[in-house]
Swiss-Prot record:
Coiled coil residues, start to end: none
Cofactor note: The heme is bound between the two transmembrane subunits.
Gene field: SDH4
Side of membrane Mitochondrial matrix, spans: 1-3, 53-58
Protein name: Succinate dehydrogenase membrane anchor subunit
Primary subcellular site in the record, as a coarse category: mitochondrion
Amino acid sequence: MITFQWLIVRVVALFISLTILIDIEMFVVMLSFLIIHISIGLKAIIHDYIHFQKIKLMLLILLRVSAIEISRSFRTFYIIIKNT
């Protein structure tokens, strides 16, 4: 069965394989898609294997916060590289 998550994972994998370091902007886009790919995978694992609702909610919040922090780090990296 094809779901939205299945489709997004495949599209992200396609974009990652097509943007092998063409330039720095494409590298940042590739890393952004990688973050999305990892987040979707970890959300699926959390939903499948964590059965306590409070722990599941806490892990999903931590996952979202960590994805935001990682993307902020990539943005900082991009700004530093772009200015050199």
